[in-house]
Amino acid sequence: KVENYRSIVLTFTATNRPGRYLKLSGLDYGKFLTFEGSEVVEAHILEEINPLSDELSINTLNLTLFNRKGDFSILNPDGVFDVLQHKQKFTVWEDVRENTRSTEIVSHNMGTFYLSDWENTSDTLASFTAVDAIGLLDSAPFNGGVYNTTVGNLVAEVLDGYEYELDAALAAESISGYLPMDTRRTALQQIAFAVGAVVDCSRSDKIKIFPAPERSSGLITYQRKFSDGNKVTLKPLITGVSVTAHRYTAGAETEELYKDELVAGTHQITFSSPALADSLAVTGGTLVERGTNYCNVTVTTPGEVVVTGQKYIETTTVLQQTASNLPPNAQDNVLTVTDATLVSPDRAEALAQRILTYYAQRYEQTFRMLAGTEVLADMLIVESFGGEMVRGQLEKMEFDLTGGYRADVRVTGRRLSLGADAYTGEIYAGERSLI
């Protein structure tokens, strides 16, 4: 075992096919272990999305493994526990028979997760908690900045070093605004919220960024549901939305951004508001790195350090929209959006409409079903109590993989007035918009 290293250099001196370029398709390191059958005591996967992306959900894996030899014992110097690493990769598969009479096994990729916590619960049992790639973004810092670029370029900067898939139409859109210093997860959330994208990692090893589907892709009948856990909840009525749009322009005046006594060494100084990076100047130290939200300064002699520069000027406008078809006795319940700093004035109206459209879907249906080919963000039609139909988006699936291919599901949508016989296989005939 090799420990305490920062990098490994591989030098290839020869190949078995002279005259051809060497191609390295991947690199696996450490022990490759497969657990299946009785070795997997518990396996729970939580998949969740937010259709508006006002938050990026983190999918999780909770796993308990059995090993008769005690290889996962913390106290075993020759065991596997000693080589486990934070962010260790887990790839999960579920083998399922298509029906009770079938002998053919179908393997479903349940996603890729990265180890966050683990513990020994006995001599033979070990419990693991892992998160998806969005969970990794939550611990990855991002310096932010002021932008006037395309969505594709900004996503590439935020997700540098991460595998992702971005819808081509979204990538070509223009985006402008400001991102503060924060995590890459928060930065990606701001982008997705501004442009109307869904972000999801389920059943994949990549971060997928795409517009939410608008057409129905499946029907969940009562026969696929288990009898326990069915519930329909009416969500609060939202009567309107107020969206603050932001615009940033470089100021012309040089201002004092920072002033304090610093000891010798290299210091990172963060600003309370964005500044033009090229305008930064330092006295009392040497400027070694600069950005919109920060600068790094090296001080050789302890003393006063002053940073000056030109601030960006923020101007805001507020757009207000009211929901349509409100009941006459509706009490005001207005949502406010104030901190979406990538929402420029030209994007405010579309964002407000998306929010009202989503919150017009007031029927939240939770149930347990035999899982199939459905994935998060699918637009589904669900048969509910009394044969009523709810058309909505699949927002959550929670799997118990050791108890069969079962999933606890949440679908949020609206009641359909048409019967099931009108279902065409893709959409309901005569279907109208929500708002």
Question: Where do the PLM segments sit?
Answer:
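Assembly/oligomerization scaffold segments
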Residues: 1-147, 177-179, 185, 190-196, ...
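Surface-exposed, non-catalytic interaction/assembly patches
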Residues: 28-47, 51, 138-149, 188-189, ...
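Loop/turn positions that initiate beta-strands
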Residues: 87, 376-380
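A generic structural signal for residues embedded in beta-strands
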Residues: 92, 382-383
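N-terminal export/assembly leaders
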Residues: 138, 154-180
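Extracytoplasmic/secreted envelope proteins and their assembly/folding machinery
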Residues: 152-156, 185-188
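Short, well-structured beta-strand/strand-turn elements
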Residues: 162-170, 193-208
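Viral virion structural and adsorption modules
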Residues: 208, 394-399, 403, 416-435
